[in-house]
């Protein structure tokens, strides 16, 4: 090939690559999914996917119910017994707002009653419980220690409940773990036997599950860290930033900041689908959600955008390539089928 032609081909290829990289993200559509009692709004917060039940868990706040949704059929089942209240016009300070799965049971908080409840999903009822020492935020089951950890940000710490070996398990207060300056969010890393939580400003802490103490503090690249999502096999921790967007920490290399992405404003609870390697980043103040591809090296690239709703600050991924997004003001969920590569 002659030199001028080689130069022309190289320039053409470079232009093509630049044009490809500059392509705008695809736009996906969200479908509304009404919740019972949603008229007037529901203070939704912590949505989770229970792999054992293969259901999306929706603690439906002031309605006094925990909603379980089959992502395949989209059938909804309600479990009552939590405190009910009238629409509060914003916030998520009433009823049940966080839940986790463990030992075949569900462990849910009740902000109004200040209780940790044990729910039998087969019977559809609350079967045990214990009083909380403070206002709760997140509940997480810790299989390695047979405990439930409940964050209490107003007390700057985590209340730890030991579970009996009985069936159903009965929770008993066991300890209080101080997390000064936090905790916000909570994820359990079973492989590393660690828990991760954010501080309200710029940092994430690593907690030894057995020792029940903070062992490391990492800068996470956010001004206001909020939600966390764990890629356990990929050894990555994603952090949602209140200023808008997310960052990724490389857990295999000292939790170094691997990459960051800015999107909108008012990001809170992010979600991750490890099969697709997609991160979901809601922007509550713009009423949108970014779909972000995570490369094998941990680099973040926005590949999609979803129009959601103002105030939609939380998301969870299921095992059907769907994302469920909370719409607190609408008292409903929004569902997106992720068809992106």
Predicted regions mapped to residue ranges:
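Sec-dependent signal peptide recognition
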Residues: 2-10, 18
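Predominantly soluble domains enriched in secretory-pathway, periplasmic, or organellar proteins
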Residues: 20-341
